[in-house]
């Protein structure tokens, strides 16, 4: 979250550049047993076209990154909200991910091959719309070949394995 905050502050100083920050997770409205009250959610935490940095400074301290990450489902849900790239305008999708897209409730079981392939399909759709994708792997399993392999499978050439707590390391890849 610190790296994202630093990037938002830096980008805010560049004239003519808009930034939208979203978080994807799950919401559990279920007070009992079972998974029927669990839903994927996408929170637009900051939109430079509408919000000021005061929002970042006052509200982001209450954000917690947790829950499962239904990546492809969330990308698909907001695809039409993303600004497409054009010859006179560049558009970037910057993603931090643990490389494990998954979600489940009583109606949906989204994980493993299905989730990986769906996320890869959504990333290809972003690219086809002229949106440049930059995806960074985060998580406790940094040295896990399996998770890094899954991450590469979803994001391909656009995947990076850097220390996401280092804004300098991230900026070198941009």
Residue ranges and their predicted role:
Residues 1-174:
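Acidic, glycine-rich A-domain
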């Amino acid at each position: 979250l610190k790296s994202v905050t630093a990037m938002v502050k830096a980008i805010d100083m560049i004239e003519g550049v808009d930034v939208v920050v979203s978080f994807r997770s799950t919401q559990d409205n279920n007070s009992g047993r079972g998974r029927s009250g669990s839903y994927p959610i996408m929170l637009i935490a900051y939109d430079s076209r509408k919000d000021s940095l005061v929002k970042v400074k006052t509200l982001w301290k209450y954000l917690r990154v947790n829950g499962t990450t239904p990546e492809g489902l969330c990308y698909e849900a907001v695809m039409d909200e993303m600004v497409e790239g054009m010859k006179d305008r560049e558009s970037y999708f910057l993603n931090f991910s643990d490389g494990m897209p998954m979600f489940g409730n009583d109606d949906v079981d989204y994980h493993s091959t299905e989730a990986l392939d769906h996320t890869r399909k959504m990333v290809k759709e972003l690219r086809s719309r002229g949106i440049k994708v930059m995806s960074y792997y985060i998580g406790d399993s940094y040295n896990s070949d399996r998770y890094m392999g899954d991450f590469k499978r979803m994001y391909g050439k656009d995947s990076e394995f850097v220390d996401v707590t280092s804004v300098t390391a991230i900026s070198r890849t941009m």
